Amino acid sequence: MALDKDIVGSIEFLEVVGLQGSTYLLKGPNGENVKLNQSEMNDDDELEVGEEYSFFIYPNRSGELFATQNMPDITKDKYDFAKVLKTDRDGARIDVGLPREVLVPWEDLPKVKSLWPQPGDHLLVTLRIDRENHMYGRLASESVVENMFTPVHDDNLKNEVIEAKPYRVLRIGSFLLSESGYKIFVHESERKAEPRLGESVQVRIIGHNDKGELNGSFLPLAHERLDDDGQVIFDLLVEYDGELPFWDKSSPEAIKEVFNMSKGSFKRAIGHLYKQKIINIETGKITLTKKGWSRMDSKE
């Protein structure tokens, strides 16, 4: 097993030694027996016995070695974001571009289960192979991210809102990485809710440190924060899929019954929301704008 482990989870040149039905038989550099299903070949490749070709080596669920010419973005030597397919009591199952899903064990996920990733989230991982040739996903550690992020030493991104994903979630704050490689820390005081591990979120940049790491916030700028009446209207809009059958000509009685505020307060609040481009005011209704929905995406 120790010899097998050397090639599992990596890209290797293997010799084609035979064909058995629709399965090619390959030989590894240490004499490992590896199988290749024809469905895992490049369309323009014809394999010849005795020749060597480049393959990615992975184990099936029984630990038997297989090869593919469809190279994954993630190997045991490379980290990248992988899409979460589902979660269960064993952990999160991710797609790394192989014929089989890969498990990130529950022990590696946050202790608070509400912070576990959901299907469609993306985890920053590499591949880990155990002594029995079982393959798992391993989350990136802080030291790994330290060596792969893109440093920023100016204020060009200040107040910009960018998309990023948490790779580490702690009570003290959220650690995120963007597609451009920016490393962002959001202190607990700069968020109202804690994002899930791997969740795509919008974060506003508020500064940087000497190492080129960015500081971010999930809170709006002070002048964009909603007053109590505006927050009531905004929360109801979110609850009712972004549309409410009320506008500035609605009756005071209906406004009082639904929003528990006077018509004057309601008109001031929707006027403020409109000026901030959070809502549109149409005949007979108010609707959330794209910017309005983004406040939810930013955990504001």
UniProtKB/Swiss-Prot annotation:
Alphabetically ordered keywords of this record: Virulence
Function text: Contributes to the expression of virulence factors and to pathogenicity. Involved in the production of hemolysin, DNase, protease and protein A.
Family to which this protein belongs: Belongs to the CvfB family.
Pfam family, one: S1_2
Keyword Chaperone attributed: no
Gene: cvfB
Alphabetical list of InterPro entries matching this protein: CvfB_fam, CvfB_S1_2nd, CvfB_S1_3rd, CvfB_S1_st, CvfB_WH, NA-bd_OB-fold, WH-like_DNA-bd_sf
Highest taxon listed in the record's lineage: Bacteria
Species of origin: Staphylococcus aureus (strain MSSA476)
Name of the featured protein: Conserved virulence factor B
